[in-house]
């Protein structure tokens, strides 16, 4: 029997928002959301825009609160922010006034690790993501792909049990995205963290994952979960195989009826900048 790292049972999420006429209305984002994530697996979640994929990840990260249901990590109810989880956002979430090395070390600093030790560890992960020579650079001096490498290194540096990734490669060009997908798999194969990965890309989900979960339109729930029985390590050429095409077709068949039927998203409170969420995750005081 597989060991379940994360268990969600009948999770629900509602919030107040403004409709197009500026009137308050209650938005039901998640309802009857059930999911079990196995320890050490790479699980991707697919779904139409606005179905609640990122909302569930934010609840799991402790950045949002469910309004019902049960959510457990390691067999214990999740209470707020879990320090054993790392989060990688689509928007990089780097602290703009910190160097690359200091950005990678920020989680260790929050945990009270001494300066010498945290910088030594940060250099190890800087090397792991292939950014030697950029330690003293600042985020604005890096390309999008390099910034996301720093974000991944930062999340891994304090050795979390679980890595939550919210469309981390969505804003990158196709070549950089495929390169970072392969890099992520290389790192995952070495460390075997439990990864929950949000994406809109069928190809990305299939290439990366052990299993793929497909969500319904809002209110979101898990419609189907299926295994990706493709050998590892996964090389780029895998995308051209008949087996890959088969899984892509299966994912699309599960998703097709949900796409296009998703309700329009009401206007909600403006989101925080991604680096402000990093501050919340660590209790890091940066004047926000």
Describe the residue ranges of each PLM region.
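The feature captures the beta-strand-to-loop junction immediately N-terminal to the Walker
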Residues: 46-48
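Short coil-to-helix segment of the ABC ATPase nucleotide-binding domain corresponding to the Q-loop/switch region
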Residues: 98-105
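Catalytic Walker B motif of ABC-type/P-loop ATPase nucleotide-binding domains
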Residues: 163-166
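Conserved ABC ATPase "signature" region
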Residues: 105, 109, 116-134, 186
